[in-house]
Amino acid sequence: MNRLLIIITFLSSFSALGQDSLSLKKAIEIGLQKNFDIQLTQKNVAINQIMNSWGEAGSLPQININVGQNNSISDQRNNPISFAPYLFQSSDVSGNLALNWTIFNGFGIQANKNKLEQLQIQSENTATLAIENTIHGIILSYYQAKMQKEQLNLIFNLIQLSKEKYDQQVLKSNLGVGVKFELLQYENNLLADSSSFYLQELAFQNSIRNLNLLMGADIEKEWILSSEIKPELNDKDFNTLKNEMLANNTNIKNQFLNISLNQQDISIAKSSFYPNINLNAGTNTSTGKLRTNDANAPIQAASNRNLNYYANFTLNFRLFDGGKVRRAIKALEIQNEMNQTQLEQMQQQLILELSNTFALYQTRKKIFELNKKAFIASKENLEIARFKEKTGLINSFNFRDIEMNYLSSGVNLYQSSFDLLESNATLLKLTGKIIQD
């Protein structure tokens, strides 16, 4: 029995050796740097920043250069109708520099640029949403682990108390004044508490692993959690929270962007009703040489060089396409109406979620206050019971009931503290303030 307590004491007292301290603030900082979801969304933001340019929108010209080199042999010696019946070798080099520029395409270029800007903002909002989810998850995982640790400490306190009572009964038995029944009862209590300790220790270790996963840290990394579970009992106004949510909620912002993107698609489609004006300009140059080794040829070699410039304008106007563009625009307008309906639906759903979370927060505040008083009372009752048990005023069964009430009230207090912190974090997330706070 002593060996069992030594092992448990060692686990409780020395498990902190070699561990780093971790506050909630530090956990969030690590998560913002290493969380995989955040890294992926930031890469997506970088892609959209690259794509958001006037060149991608089609505003800038395209310039191409082409260079070619040709060689040929022409044997006219057996051609009776040739005026130059000789063997000729020719070679030439040609080059072309061409510029293609869409000067006007029915305001489609501006619409494309606006869409690219909105896609960049949308990716940034998606990154913001990933950050909000990560912070929310880390807060809950951190306090979950802290709650498991505090419950582990409660059980360890009970083990020490049970060991104290067990040692007293062993001493009484050795002196011949003890009762075997009482000794077995305290031994059973000590074994039961030790079993609970191991199970609770496993729950604590698993909660640390979950926290490490969210932070992007090594899964088996061990921490000393330095931030306390201290819920802030602030009074909150539902209407204020509602207005903040409708103005700042990231999901609502993204839905507004979806509507705006759809409107840009309509503008792009309508640009087909306008003429397109294009400029094609450039220069062509070529240099060639013709030669023959025939001594009878009047000219042994000749060369030529050409240089041309051109600039052409084209106007393209679509007269009829079978109503394809008009059907596409009509479909986009219907999609825009759907997006508006989805926005209204989302707002109502979020208002409902906010209302439920706010009501739950108010209820959990009351439960926390009650559990806090209950724990204080059970702690005082345990101290009184320790004195009464020593003086024989209560038996081991009565004392065990008081111990279990102390443990239960402690667990309830930490659980209600966690629940209150969870509701507060969810309210911050819904109102778009979790990053600010």
Residue ranges and their predicted role:
Residues 39-43, 56, 89, 103-131, ...:
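Sec/SRP-type N-terminal targeting helices
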Residues 66-101, 226-233, 267, 280-317:
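Small/polar, glycine/serine/threonine/aspartate-rich low-complexity segments that form flexible
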Residues 173-177, 389-393, 430:
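A short glycine-centered flexible hinge/capping loop motif at secondary-structure junctions
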Residues 4-13:
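Sec-dependent N-terminal signal peptides
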Residues 412-437:
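Acidic, low-complexity, intrinsically disordered peripheral segments
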Residues 50, 133-246, 357-360, 364, ...:
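Periplasmic alpha-helical coiled-coil/stalk elements that build and connect Gram-negative outer-membrane
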Residues 18-68, 74, 178-179, 219-263, ...:
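Bacterial Sec-pathway N-terminal export signals of envelope proteins
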Residues 19-141, 277, 281, 323-326:
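Short flexible linkers and secondary-structure junctions
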